[in-house]
Amino acid sequence: SEPGRREGKRSYSMEHFRWGKPVGKKRRPVKVYPNGAEDESAEAFPLEFKRELAGERPEPALGPEGAAEGMAALADLEYGLVAKAEVAEKKDDGPYKMEHFRWGSPGKDKRYGGFMTSEKSQTPLVTLFKNAIIKNAHKKGQ
């Protein structure tokens, strides 16, 4: 009776999806630490001392698992430094570029909320107002 109860629970918990169960796993964000390497000395030493320690580390004495972790920590440290340099370069490029639209900036008619409005729908309203004004003027004239 245990698997049946689990299936019942699953179908209940998936009812908030529109077409049944979700496809694939939920993506979890990758944790990015600002200080780069993840070891015990991360809090104790500033960035310059960590670089010196990484250079003086005797890799053959660590063993196969320790060497792999040491290389991964070095790669993470380098990746963090390269990413920071790229961000600094991008900030100095100049004016803001609209890169979040697929083919550059949107058209002038679409810029300020123009996605939802259409100009054709306003013409009947204008004619209605014109007719009301004309009728009102005729009534006052008589």
UniProtKB/Swiss-Prot annotation:
ACTH and MSH are produced by the pituitary gland. Transmembrane segments: none annotated. InterPro entries: Mcrtin_ACTH_cent (IPR013531), Opioid_neuropept (IPR013532), PMOC (IPR001941), POMC-derived_peptides (IPR050878). One of its GO terms (cellular component) is extracellular space. GO terms for molecular function: G protein-coupled receptor binding; hormone activity. The modification Phosphoserine is found at residue 41. GO terms for biological process: neuropeptide signaling pathway; regulation of corticosterone secretion. The keyword Isomerase does not apply. Residues 1-8 form a propeptide. Keywords: Amidation, Cleavage on pair of basic residues, Endorphin, Hormone, Phosphoprotein, Secreted. Belongs to the POMC family. This is Pro-opiomelanocortin. The lineage of its organism: Eukaryota, Metazoa, Chordata, Craniata, Vertebrata.
